[in-house]
């Protein structure tokens, strides 16, 4: 296969990341230098992000039968790269205290980023499966990186086993679909679904159901969510900022791309499965979050409901497909910056703790009285996650609710309302905890530096908070940008 100049330009972000991976490997082999590897990794990801500018004029474009670049893919790739950059920035102060090899952490993040970007542009089941694994395999190491902590290895082992089961379902589904379609690209599967006989359609539907089951596991939605709180609790906080954003954004992107070939509103089986999973995810995620005393487990359960809201865009008819792309992009922008800021603050507090662990919600009691700016940013982030007006989170939820109204999804709308009320109570419980007077029963062994706002992590946290507030008050620049790309 001959690749022309335009196709080579389209691959520029991937080529830059590959070059970064090779350089980091050589640096580790010859001379370990934590600072150099960290800076070079961040610069490589920034250059990859900037290279997306050169793709704007050449899209849409196919690179072989495996990859398809369009404006929507560029938007998701940008989100993934922002998440990866923030993860490397958050990880540096934590790794300074890490007693074992530090440089491999950045290598695993970059390799997983490579898989996430490749998955976003996948247009074929071969690249789809390979890139799912390319995301997951480094993630095993990242989750277990803090191996001296109590739950780290346990969480990694759980994720390895369950991820293996998920991959087996994915391969099983691909095999069933291929038996009828005779091809592995998404268009061939679409054609087999439309022109197959009644018996063959049942086989294709079963295969698609297995594929969706695997993706639902990666998105950690009900009923494939039971592993989520344990993984969140056992993983290093800086890893969670990557796991909960880049990993899920890439999987959602390929899910949206795959299902775009099928009219979910016309197919009753897929429509029913999606509707049931969405309702359960919204309600169960928020309901379980009510009873959590660990901040990481709390964020794990709320992530289930947040992805549940997002999946509503999959239920639109073809005539409203472009609006669903706009709604999902706006919602994901709010989701991305909320998670970056929230987990950045949790990481900052945890690394400042005497035991490098401040996961208990009680650790945050009265934080406002000692660190008012940090508490204010955390309050803003939680308010945005709850979907309160004047924040980007509200704009995202408003667009999702618009889809509910346009498509007349009244049962899902009722679940949306109940879930939002439960979520509001969950977030307000933590917000109020920040402004209570510090309890004498719970000693907070925190040593947060007074100049935290001038550190790289602090700058990222503050910028994320400003974005959530500014785009919540005046969202037109973001909406205009997304409309131009879609």
Curated annotation (Swiss-Prot):
Membrane topology: Multi-pass membrane protein
E.C. numbers: 7.1.1.-
EC class (word): translocase
Transmembrane regions listed in the UniProt entry: 8-28, 36-56, 74-94, 104-124, 125-145, 160-180, 201-221, 239-259, 269-289, 298-318, 329-349, 376-396, 410-432, 459-479
InterPro entries the UniProt entry points to: NADH-Q_OxRdtase_suN/2 (IPR010096), ND/Mrp_TM (IPR001750)
Pfam families documented for this protein: Proton_antipo_M
UniProt family annotation: Belongs to the complex I subunit 2 family.
Protein purpose: NDH-1 shuttles electrons from NADH, via FMN and iron-sulfur (Fe-S) centers, to quinones in the respiratory chain. The immediate electron acceptor for the enzyme in this species is believed to be ubiquinone. Couples the redox reaction to proton translocation (for every two electrons transferred, four hydrogen ions are translocated across the cytoplasmic membrane), and thus conserves the redox energy in a proton gradient.
Quaternary state and interactors: NDH-1 is composed of 13 different subunits. Subunits NuoA, H, J, K, L, M, N constitute the membrane sector of the complex.
Annotated NCBIfam families: NDH_I_N (TIGR01770)
Name of the protein this chain belongs to: NADH-quinone oxidoreductase subunit N
Upper taxonomic lineage: Bacteria, Pseudomonadati, Pseudomonadota, Gammaproteobacteria, Enterobacterales
Annotated gene: nuoN
């Amino acid at each position: 296969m001959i690749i022309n100049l335009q196709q080579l330009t389209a691959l520029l972000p991937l080529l830059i990341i590959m070059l970064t991976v090779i350089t980091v490997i050589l640096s580790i082999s010859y001379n370990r230098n934590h600072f150099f590897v960290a800076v070079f990794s961040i610069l490589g990801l920034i250059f990859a992000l900037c290279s997306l500018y050169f793709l704007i004029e050449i899209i849409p474009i196919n690179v072989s039968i495996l990859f398809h670049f369009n404006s929507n893919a560029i938007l998701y790739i940008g989100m993934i790269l922002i998440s990866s950059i923030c993860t490397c920035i958050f990880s540096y102060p934590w790794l300074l205290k890490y007693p074992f090899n530090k440089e491999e952490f950045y290598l695993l993040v970059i390799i997983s980023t490579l898989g996430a970007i490749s998955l976003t542009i996948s247009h074929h089941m071969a690249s789809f499966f390979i890139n799912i694994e390319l995301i997951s395999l480094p993630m095993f190491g990242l989750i277990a990186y803090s191996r001296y902590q109590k739950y780290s290895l346990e969480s990694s082992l759980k994720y390895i086993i369950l991820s293996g089961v998920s991959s087996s379902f994915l391969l099983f589904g691909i095999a069933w679909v291929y038996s009828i379609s005779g091809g592995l690209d998404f268009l061939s599967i679409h054609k087999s679904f439309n022109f197959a006989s009644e018996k063959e359609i049942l086989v294709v539907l079963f295969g698609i159901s297995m594929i969706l089951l695997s993706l639902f596991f990666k998105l950690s939605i009900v009923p494939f969510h039971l592993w989520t709180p344990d993984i969140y609790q056992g993983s290093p906080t800086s890893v969670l900022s990557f796991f909960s954003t880049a990993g899920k954004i890439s999987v959602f992107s390929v899910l949206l791309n795959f299902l775009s070939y099928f009219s979910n509103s016309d197919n009753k089986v897929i429509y029913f499965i999606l509707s049931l999973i969405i309702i359960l995810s919204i309600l169960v995620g928020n309901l379980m979050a009510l009873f959590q005393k660990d901040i990481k487990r709390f964020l794990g359960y709320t992530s289930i409901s947040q992805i549940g809201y997002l999946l509503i865009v999959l239920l639109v008819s073809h005539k409203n497909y472009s609006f669903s792309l706009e709604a999902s992009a706006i919602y994901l922008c709010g989701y991305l910056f909320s998670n970056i800021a929230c987990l950045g603050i949790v990481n900052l507090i945890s690394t400042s703790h005497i035991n490098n662990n401040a996961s208990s919600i009680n650790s945050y009691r009265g934080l406002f009285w000692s660190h008012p700016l940090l508490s204010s940013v955390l309050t803003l982030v939680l308010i945005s996650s709850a979907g309160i007006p004047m924040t980007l989170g509200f704009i995202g939820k408003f667009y999702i609710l618009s889809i509910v109204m346009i498509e007349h999804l009244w049962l899902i709308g009722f679940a949306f309302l109940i879930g939002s009320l439960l979520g509001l109570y969950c977030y307000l419980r933590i917000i109020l905890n920040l402004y209570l007077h510090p309890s004498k029963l719970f000693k907070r062994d925190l040593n947060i530096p007074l100049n935290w706002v001038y550190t790289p992590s602090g700058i990222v946290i503050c910028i994320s908070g400003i974005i959530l507030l500014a785009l919540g008050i005046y969202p037109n620049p973001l909406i205009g940008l997304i409309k131009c790309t879609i």
